[in-house]
Amino acid sequence: MVAYLNIHTAYDLLNSSLKIEDAVRLAVSENVDALAITDTNVLYGFPKFYDACIANNIKPIFGMTIYVTNGLNTVETVVLAKNNDGLKDLYQLSSEIKMNSMENVSFELLQQFSSNLIIIFKNVADEHRDIVQVFDSHEDTYLDHQSVLVQGIKHVWIQNVCYQTRQDADTISALAAIRDNAKLDLIHDQEDFGAHFLTEKEIKQLDINQEYLTQVDVIAQKCNAELKYHQSLLPQYQTPNDESAKKYLWRVLVTQLKKLELNYDVYLERLKYEYKVITNMGFEDYFLIVSDLIHYAKTNDVMVGPGRGSSAGSLVSYLLGITTIDPIKFNLLFERFLNPERVTMPDIDIDFEDTRRERVIQYVQEKYGELHVSGIVTFGHLLARAVARDVGRIMGFDEVTLNEISSLIPHKLGITLDEAYQIDDFKKFVHRNHRHERWFSICKKLEGLPRHTSTHAAGIIINDHPLYEYAPLTKGDTGLLTQWTMTEAERIGLLKIDFLGLRNLSIIHQILIQVKKDLGINIDIEKIPFDDQKVFELLSQGDTTGIFQLESDGVRSVLKKLKPEHFEDIVAVTSLYRPGPMEEIPTYITRRHDPSKVQYLHPHLEPILKNTYGVIIYQEQIMQIASTFANFSYGEADILRRAMSKKNRAVLESERQHFIEGAKQNGYHEDISKQIFDLILKFADYGFPRAHAVSYSKIAYIMSFLKVHYPNYFYANILSNVIGSEKKTAQMIEEAKKQGITILPPNINESHWFYKPSQEGIYLSIGTIKGVGYQSVKVIVDERYQNGKFKDFFDFARRIPKRVKTRKLLEALILVGAFDAFGKTRSTLLQAIDQVLDGDLNIEQDGFLFDILTPKQMYEDKEELPDALISQYEKEYLGFYVSQHPVDKKFVAKQYLTIFKLSNAQNYKPILVQFDKVKQIRTKNGQNMAFVTLNDGIETLDGVIFPNQFKKYEELLSHNDLFIVSGKFDHRKQQRQLIINEIQTLATFEEQKLAFAKQIIIRNKSQIDMFEEMIKATKENANDVVLSFYDETIKQMTTLGYINQKDSMFNNFIQSFNPSDIRLI
């Protein structure tokens, strides 16, 4: 038997460039019979290695390279599993090494696991004899062919393999440089390490002792371990009084069913069916385990989502409290979740509020034991963009070149270097010089290799035995991880549950806590009305910022057109707004507003598709159609649905015949049967699981309900979740203002790190202030809790420690208004900073001694800072304006001129702004132009003034004034900007608008009677302007008459209206 006993795969991270599939391919081409995977200290690659070997008729041998020490010397050692007990020993040995961050293994530890292992010591020298001789009585101890002779121990030929061919030796140097954050020496780091996959011809050319080769065959024959997939490894649930899980589960379910006010007989029938399926499959422990951890969460102040995925289709899940979705009420199918005709582990994913998810994981660890619970490893790979930068960095490319590389590779998920090479600019870069070509060659060899490990975001493995009995473990950032990925661990048979952290649940929970604390209202989200018209009005207006699943611009647009009237509309929207089914949205909306346009291919489709107006939206509908027409069981229907989504032609043709035959036997004509099959085939590609849609729509509805009825609390918590994002915070602040919510400046006696809702409005977070860190906020808030609110600015300065009380902090707090409640102007407080920072006030002492030993602090009252300066400081320190910005204030007064904000302006429409910055530059042709920053009082935008316009408006730009600008919107470096075509002062624009208006549109006729004499029925001369009334209730414009612009009362007429009720066109 020809065997390689020392293969290091790419899962020996950054030590080998040999992919498992390449090792197996080479083995096949060189007639190798067996391969041993021997990565250093880890077993990451075992499942992939085993599958690849079995698929190619190669014998897989499981092993590991370790470094054995006696405290003085260390020897490289390969250990191979002889059997499945040896495989388990490898699991535990690797787990011990990785969990304890060992670099070397003591010979005593190796002895504990040696009985079912073959041990091969490598490169043994005289100083290693003491270690080796400890194992001389071990039946299967060997030395490699390069070791010294040790009496009684046989030698074996063993070839270290880390890369494919001699030409790939540079990959090892490159990987080492990436690992060590070093530079790659392209001249001296290109030695051949002698670790490539030897060809049959190369082996024959070696002068190898035949006895050594014989031992290779002996060892390969002795190694007969195999991975066991699909084991039954479900942990047993500890029931009270050791009652069987089956009996206990039934007792709990019936007890709960009796508590609910439901149609008992209907629900009992469904319950009996589900219970039978679950117990026949042996999953009763699974449901009890999941129910237990959710019960812990709910009784320990951790919010749990209503359901996720198809599990909401289970009545058992509903009765156990795993979900809060009644599957019968919402017409959900159990078989979509658990199919009795396709036995697979049920998959219940659980959403917890993200800030308290760890509590539940900790509970599971305490209940089952630390070694019985783990997270799951994932691997980061050297994909195109990452490998390009990594190799560029180790080759000494400067930052400019590295950025050029990044810009040349498109931001496309899964893009390869070969795909990037098809782009001309990237190809030119590669062939710019020999160094770049060498860079590309190394990148290509390393592309796709695993680079590092990380933790799966949600998966938790649970077992009632130590997990290392079934899979190797390693240490992650926050606990243990399996060394195998999620799919590999599940394939072994281990129970995996996804504990997902959902930010929106944290927001909901915080709102409920605060409303109860502040208002004394205990909101039970399971009892809120799901037909609240105010909620549907909110959704119909597209006012869904901060609403789970509904806040994208596209969904808002759909909601405005659809105008939801009931919960099912929300379920439909969340299901339709995805690639594929989006094309059905116009049909759905049209039919929803005019049911007469609904058409069915066959009348028997109506009961199934009535709620979705004839449009197939849900996977469950496909299953129901198959059941109705072809008499499929729901289990068979689920298999059909899966086959359709996978597009396997052979399977699809078989299912087509199955469906048509079933339909014929059920009394349907063959033609209609084929049409129905084609219909569901079309939608199967993107049908959405209704159970998941209902569950997530429930979260969306709850958030909408809270937004409608407790807006201050809603926005405060949404804002608290975007701390750190200046752009999102500014957007949310602006929306809250539009909703009539008062945004209060940070208040030193009220504010926290998070935003604080109150009945008056929302206090800004102290943490929002630039230059004020979390620790400073914590000190301030802790002092306030311990010793009461601050009496004034001087009291604050005395009580806050010197290490926190810096000029920078005090200025920031003053300039955003944190001390405004003390009744002193911000300029007065700025003047007082020197007093509080002098020597006496920096002495931290108790208040009594301070009052005696220090002179009374006095304010020197100053006039308040100008509004423009206050706004400027707020923008500087907060990223947005709290007080009304002068531009925004002027906009409110002058909106009758039909002017726009940056956010809603279109090309060439007049926009009121100030210029925050004007940067003049000279073009290559020697002409002047400018880049400017426009500010409309709410947001800022970059603008460009090209030479012709700059020459025209250069003098205007030197004025500190408010301007009306217009131009064309464009994108530069993926950022929106305005190419400015025209600039006027506001005063000039207003004068011209009044002089040349063609029409006046009013929205309120209450002032008309006062000016009745001015209004003429017909146009008499060129100075007459049309006066129109726009009735918003019926969306209709009517002409009231004409007004002469030259009339002395014309301006009085204009000014008599609220600026929001009149427009000059």
Swiss-Prot record:
Question: What does UniProt give as GO cellular component?
Answer: cytoplasm
Q: What is its main location?
A: cytoplasm
Gene Ontology molecular-function annotations: 3'-5' exonuclease activity; DNA-directed DNA polymerase activity; nucleic acid binding
Cellular compartment(s)? Cytoplasm
Query: Mind telling me which InterPro entries this protein's record contains?
Result: DNA_pol3_alpha_NTPase_dom, DNA_pol3_alpha_thumb_dom, DNA_pol3_finger, DnaE2/DnaE/PolC, DNAPol_HHH, NA-bd_OB_tRNA, PHP_dom, Pol/His_phosphatase_N
CDD domains annotated for this entry? DnaE_OBF (cd04485), PHP_PolIIIA (cd07431)
Spell out the Gene3D superfamilies in the cross-references. Answer: 1.10.150.870, Bacterial DNA polymerase III alpha subunit, thumb domain, Metal-dependent hydrolases
Q: Which reaction does it catalyse?
A: DNA(n) + a 2'-deoxyribonucleoside 5'-triphosphate = DNA(n+1) + diphosphate
Cite the EC number: 2.7.7.7
Which SUPFAM superfamilies does UniProt cross-reference here? Answer: PHP domain-like (SSF89550)
What does it do?
DNA polymerase III is a complex, multichain enzyme responsible for most of the replicative synthesis in bacteria. This DNA polymerase also exhibits 3' to 5' exonuclease activity. The alpha chain is the DNA polymerase.
The family this protein is said to belong to = Belongs to the DNA polymerase type-C family. DnaE subfamily.
What name does the UniProt record give this protein?
DNA polymerase III subunit alpha
